[in-house]
């Protein structure tokens, strides 16, 4: 089932998006494809699947490692490839007056 342009416009209003006519047509197709995929998922028989609260069971969680301290770059090394720097800091164009 394809989404109408009017439905896309309504979704855009709810999402506070301003879309061009071309974007409305593009999103209509993309959203329709997503909804078709969701409809296919709704048809799956999941009665034998046990509900889960996580993607992995509690015993399958990845092992945690201890934090380790590693040497880092000096400020000079970190800024060596910068197009502009001031001392040991990156120099960037002012964007706020």
Swiss-Prot record:
GO terms for molecular function: asparaginyl-tRNA synthase (glutamine-hydrolyzing) activity; ATP binding; glutaminyl-tRNA synthase (glutamine-hydrolyzing) activity. It comes from the Bacteria. Signal peptide: none annotated. GO terms for biological process: glutaminyl-tRNAGln biosynthesis via transamidation; regulation of translational fidelity; translation. It catalyses: L-glutamyl-tRNA(Gln) + L-glutamine + ATP + H2O = L-glutaminyl-tRNA(Gln) + L-glutamate + ADP + phosphate + H(+); L-aspartyl-tRNA(Asn) + L-glutamine + ATP + H2O = L-asparaginyl-tRNA(Asn) + L-glutamate + ADP + phosphate + 2 H(+). Its EC number is 6.3.5.-. InterPro entries: Asp/Glu-ADT_sf_sub_c, GatC. It is an enzyme of class 6 (ligase). Keywords: ATP-binding, Ligase, Nucleotide-binding, Protein biosynthesis. Belongs to the GatC family. Allows the formation of correctly charged Asn-tRNA(Asn) or Gln-tRNA(Gln) through the transamidation of misacylated Asp-tRNA(Asn) or Glu-tRNA(Gln) in organisms which lack either or both of asparaginyl-tRNA or glutaminyl-tRNA synthetases. The reaction takes place in the presence of glutamine and ATP through an activated phospho-Asp-tRNA(Asn) or phospho-Glu-tRNA(Gln). Heterotrimer of A, B and C subunits. This is Aspartyl/glutamyl-tRNA(Asn/Gln) amidotransferase subunit C. The lineage of its organism: Bacteria, Pseudomonadati, Myxococcota, Myxococcia, Myxococcales.
């Amino acid at each position: 089932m394809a989404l109408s342009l009017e439905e896309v416009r309504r979704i855009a209003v709810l999402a506070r998006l301003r879309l061009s006519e071309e974007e409305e047509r593009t999103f209509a197709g993309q959203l329709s494809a997503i909804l078709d995929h969701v409809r296919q998922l709704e048809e799956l028989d999941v009665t034998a699947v046990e509900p889960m609260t996580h993607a992995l069971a509690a015993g399958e969680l990845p092992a945690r490692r201890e934090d380790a301290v590693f040497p880092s770059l000096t400020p000079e090394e970190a800024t060596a490839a910068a197009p502009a720097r001031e001392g040991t800091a990156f120099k960037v164009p002012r964007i706020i007056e």
